[in-house]
């Protein structure tokens, strides 16, 4: 049964981009900045509406809204507001570009985005990436990664996952057996087998394969991945399995570990909260509450501070 996706941010009723542009200008003009007005306004408008405000701001004041926001705000709060202002169709592509740019590769970002986006979303990301950066996402990924990790990313980026159709029980059995043979029953691991099955079979088929695998082997597929692989490949295969089981649950877990323990991974916190605010953040909140002994709202509240915290809590949209 398909889950109905629900975001926390929707179009603001009675939206007036000129009035909003004036409110923002007033909040930034003269001495000091009225951060409260900025964050309240921007978190309650959809991304499409924020783009309209930006255009109205340019028309009314001859100024670039994003530049003004950047010069008035600082730190994590600035990063969050800048992320909210990015056109949503560009946001994932932008994050991937930055993960690949310069010295070192941010595998965490590559893994999270590429594993948790649907084939349709991945196709759109590839298109936007090429338009924006003049190079192919796939080529850039190949140039910056290696081994089976690279291979799995490329297979996912092909976005050729089978569409969900009727379940073929014989094929389910065959794939589950093949995974068992490729891992637990083999000296060493046949990574290619995992990559092909995880990267090309339909979501509903794979859910059945994971159940069947448990029956055949006595292990959850995650335990096998943990034992049979390591490093970036292990992280990616686990992210794919978790996303196949439930994207909101995978992203809830991603948020949880971004905040758990000492220090906060603010980059991840901002990326997930912003990129999912209009897609499935309500679903993520529900999974968070179900799987961890607290709510997303309380965890953000305890883990962040100041205007940054206020803005994140407004995006979160409530306690569960």
Swiss-Prot record:
Monomer. Binds ATRX and EIF5B. The keyword Phosphoprotein applies. GO terms for biological process: blood coagulation; negative regulation of coagulation. There is a cross-link at residue 29 (Glycyl lysine isopeptide (Lys-Gly) (interchain with G-Cter in SUMO2)). It holds the Pfam family Annexin. Belongs to the annexin family. Transmembrane segments: none annotated. A pair of annexin repeats may form one binding site for calcium and phospholipid. The [IL]-x-C-x-x-[DE] motif is a proposed target motif for cysteine S-nitrosylation mediated by the iNOS-S100A8/A9 transnitrosylase complex. There is a cross-link at residue 29 (Glycyl lysine isopeptide (Lys-Gly) (interchain with G-Cter in SUMO1)). Keywords: Acetylation, Annexin, Blood coagulation, Calcium, Calcium/phospholipid-binding, Hemostasis, Isopeptide bond, Phosphoprotein, Repeat, S-nitrosylation, Ubl conjugation. This is Annexin A5. The modification N6-acetyllysine is found at residues 70, 76, 79, 97, 101. Annexin repeats lie at residues 15-86, 87-158, 170-242, 246-317. PANTHER family: ANNEXIN, ANNEXIN A5. GO terms for cellular component: cytoplasm; nucleus; plasma membrane; vesicle membrane. This protein is an anticoagulant protein that acts as an indirect inhibitor of the thromboplastin-specific complex, which is involved in the blood coagulation cascade. The modification Phosphoserine is found at residue 37. GO terms for molecular function: calcium ion binding; calcium-dependent phospholipid binding; phosphatidylserine binding. InterPro entries: Annexin, Annexin_repeat, Annexin_repeat_CS, Annexin_sf, ANX5. A motif ([IL]-x-C-x-x-[DE] motif) lies at residues 314-320. S-nitrosylation is induced by interferon-gamma and oxidatively-modified low-densitity lipoprotein (LDL(ox)) possibly implicating the iNOS-S100A8/9 transnitrosylase complex. The modification N-acetylalanine is found at residue 2.
